[in-house]
């Protein structure tokens, strides 16, 4: 079997014995740049990697197969998970743990707020979560601008 890739507009497409590799009925396997294409090509040649959903090939197949409906589902999952995010959840009495979390996670949350122009707050009450709809709308708007590959990476990392 001979695997190759060719540049096509803004992406690289992959071929197996000169036939386009498709990940679904309508979607070809794509890469966003030359280095990404070379990593996928390496994985295509390595049979063991094909079953690993977190390999470059596995993530690329996932991203290449996304349609608008799936993109909206993923964004919905990310926004829903934000309501009970473990970095934001601070409703417990363990002072040592709270101090450690404040030290290690607060800079990350501050950076996130600046990067995405939001104001995520700590979850300190089950009934009321101050991470309001406005912040989620801004974040959703940002995520809708991401290409499928960047959204896939964000989704997979946020699900770990």
Whereabouts are the PLM-identified features?
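Glycine-rich loop/turn
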Residues: 1-29, 35-47
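Short, charged/polar micro-motifs that form catalytic or ligand-binding hotspots
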Residues: 27-30, 95-98, 151-156
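Generic, well-ordered alpha-helical segments
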Residues: 29-32, 54, 70, 100
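Predominant activation on well-ordered alpha-helical scaffold segments within soluble catalytic domains
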Residues: 38, 106-109, 160
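Short secondary-structure junctions and interdomain/linker hinges
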Residues: 47-51, 85, 115, 119, ...
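A glycine-rich, hydrophobic loop/mini-helix early in the fold
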Residues: 48-91
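Internal, conserved structured core segments that host functional sites
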Residues: 73-135
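A mid-sequence, solvent-exposed acidic-amphipathic segment
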Residues: 119-160
């Amino acid at each position: 079997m001979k695997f190759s890739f060719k540049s096509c507009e803004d992406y690289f497409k992959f071929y197996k014995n000169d036939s386009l590799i498709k990940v679904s009925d309508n979607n070809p396997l794509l890469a966003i740049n030359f280095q990404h294409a070379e990593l996928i090509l390496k994985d295509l040649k390595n049979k063991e990697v094909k079953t690993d959903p977190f390999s470059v090939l596995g993530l690329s197949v996932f991203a290449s197969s996304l349609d608008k409906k799936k993109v909206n589902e993923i964004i919905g999952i990310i926004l829903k998970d934000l309501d009970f995010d473990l970095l934001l959840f601070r409703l417990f009495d363990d002072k040592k743990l709270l101090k450690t979390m404040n030290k290690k996670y607060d800079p990350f949350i501050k950076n996130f707020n600046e990067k995405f122009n939001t104001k995520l707050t700590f979850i300190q009450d089950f009934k009321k979560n101050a991470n309001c709809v406005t912040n989620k709308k801004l974040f959703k708007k940002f995520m809708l601008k991401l290409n499928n590959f960047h959204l896939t990476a964000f989704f997979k990392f946020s699900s770990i």
